[in-house]
Amino acid sequence: MRPLPGAPGVAAAAALLLLLLPRARSDEHEHTYQDKEEVVLWMNTVGPYHNRQETYKYFSLPFCVGSKKSISHYHETLGEALQGVELEFSGLDIKFKDDVMPGTYCEIDLDKEKRDAFVYAIKNHYWYQMYIDDLPIWGIVGEADENGEDYYLWTYKKLEIGFNGNRIVDVNLTSEGKVKLVPNTKIQMSYSVKWKKSDVKFEDRFDKYLDPSFFQHRIHWFSIFNSFMMVIFLVGLVSMILMRTLRKDYARYSKEEEMDDMDRDLGDEYGWKQVHGDVFRPSSHPLIFSSLIGSGCQIFAVSLIVIIVAMIEDLYTERGSMLSTAIFVYAATSPVNGYFGGSLYARQGGRRWIKQMFIGAFLIPAMVCGTAFFINFIAIYYHASRAIPFGTMVAVCCICFFVILPLNLVGTILGRNLSGQPNFPCRVNAVPRPIPEKKWFMEPAVIVCLGGILPFGSIFIEMYFIFTSFWAYKIYYVYGFMMLVLVILCIVTVCVTIVCTYFLLNAEDYRWQWTSFLSAASTAIYVYMYSFYYYFFKTKMYGLFQTSFYFGYMAVFSTALGIMCGAIGYMGTSAFVRKIYTNVKID
């Protein structure tokens, strides 16, 4: 039997996407245990408290490991590998429901080099993270005395593990045994395990890590209410102004239709009707413009789907699951990019559709991978756990070439064939109409700069909560708020760009495509400016790696947000422009 065309590529794509999905392995992933069954304590990373993303392998500090036989851990998902999860076996002997009395599990032979490493870690407030049954545990490395002359290491890990039936539902760590760091001495590391019955349900075991008092604060509710009221006011204002203004315009244009040619020539003709022969003229640089619109539509689809999935599933309970889900959804929604970008490029008369398809497919991945590649050099120099392994890079490249590109090609072909024919309500003139002079505040550059203020105002409070959950130590879980804010952002963006475009066309300037896109996309400029304020006034980050990581990925986030807002603004404005020129009689 002859194999189907493209079958090897489909098989390779399926295998690559399986990397994004968690693999089942042992009872740790079933989250059920038998009495006396082994429970693994994984050591993850260690790093400065104020630099959340600057993390290193736990055993990069001269900690000792327990005597139990080592267990290897592999990255279960692509999200884990990209987020720098580096689980290493602690060597501690822990069994389900089996208490362990205080005892030594290893000994550190503290020479001067090891002492200096611990002192540096304590000076920089290093903390470490561990996992038991996918439940995170945090601890501090040590502390200094009031004078900052003597340094102490916490040597005793006191674990209290709560269980409900055959499941682990709670883990607490108490650090004790403060020992002064003195060169050429031996430090004994010890631990104990106490099991206790708990009434906490397995489904609710992550509730203790959430912070309702922070995310459901009155300010958060007030900001949502304030943004919602702004939407109602803005929609009402835009509707009233445009309906009244357009009604007058239609009446004036109808009156002009009743005039004879002499009266019409002597009349004072002005307004958006005068550019009917140029308003549907292709935008400048249609290849780039179409690719941006397609990418923006895909980012919106990804945002919408991921938020819905996060509302249904508690993605924060699994390491790297949010990032893995986002990558999977981005790859799966590639036809959206191809469809909207390819159809728009075809309607604008573009002929290099293959080049447009490639640019649309790789625009966002190239931006993200380029930034990650730059930061990866710094991470490698720092020997940080955030350094992306070579195998992970290869996997990401394969996803781009064997999943995203073919799906984008499918979307492009569908877009060109289903909605690629121009169907404008007005005929485009052969010769472009000269653009008259206008007041300075009607210039496209000014409109672009001002267009992002209101959309940013509708989301900047939510930006604080999102930033805090990513750059600080909060778990974002109120995705219902995020969905509402996304809807508000879309409505405000469309309303603002429609008003901006109306005034631009009324000034007889038909360059509305890029203006509508950029005026909506300028929201990204204000978000990035806000990230500077957040960095300097809301965090205590320091160092080259953390600073590069912060501003690098904030630039990626802001750019992606801007492309999404620009696409939303253009799509809404395009429908508006088509509507008003459909309803007016053109000779």
UniProtKB/Swiss-Prot annotation:
It comes from the Eukaryota. Its main location: membrane. It holds the Pfam family EMP70. InterPro entries: EMP70. It is a multi-pass membrane protein. It is found in: Membrane. The keyword Glycoprotein applies. Keywords: Glycoprotein, Membrane, Signal, Transmembrane, Transmembrane helix. The keyword Transcription does not apply. The chain crosses the membrane at residues 222-242, 292-312, 326-346, 358-378, 387-407, 447-467, 480-500, 517-537, 549-569. Coiled coil: none annotated. Residues 1-26 form the signal peptide. One of its GO terms (cellular component) is membrane. Glycans are attached at N172, N417. Belongs to the nonaspanin (TM9SF) (TC 9.A.2) family. This is Transmembrane 9 superfamily member 3. It comes from Mus musculus.
